[in-house]
């Protein structure tokens, strides 16, 4: 009887653990870019150029983006023109753009907290999008920190630390490698010059 009880306890624990570890979220990065030499007529400029790009968070078939409105230099949090939105998929071309996706296992509690944040932040953004303020990298870090994946920062420190996507991407890639999380990458088309992950900045 004792052996049977131990086996039952083991299977219950294994079942609960497996169930709790099946939740995953994606952190998606689009790399900054500009038209390659000789392709300025064919390719358009993009916001931010080489230091541009984008980052968003995907979970449960929904993508949370933080996008500009009137793109002010300084935020107007009382009347924000930009903010969070929910989309069905990433907006960039996954076949020809350069991107990286980090797949992160999370607990059921973290997953549900994220779903609630997606709903509440999309309904009412907690801050405005601004050139010298919260942008996609800092906003994404804020969301990830609120579900316990990273240390929470005050907005001022968050903005300074994650001023553009590459700064967050390098941190996330190192963190993912240290934790053996799955990383998917795709090289972009040669008609654009793409940002690399080399260098401090």
Regions found by a protein language model. Name each.
Residues 20-101:
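Glycine-rich catalytic cores of cysteine/serine-nucleophile enzymes that process amide/ester linkages
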Residues 3-14:
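Sec-dependent N-terminal signal peptides
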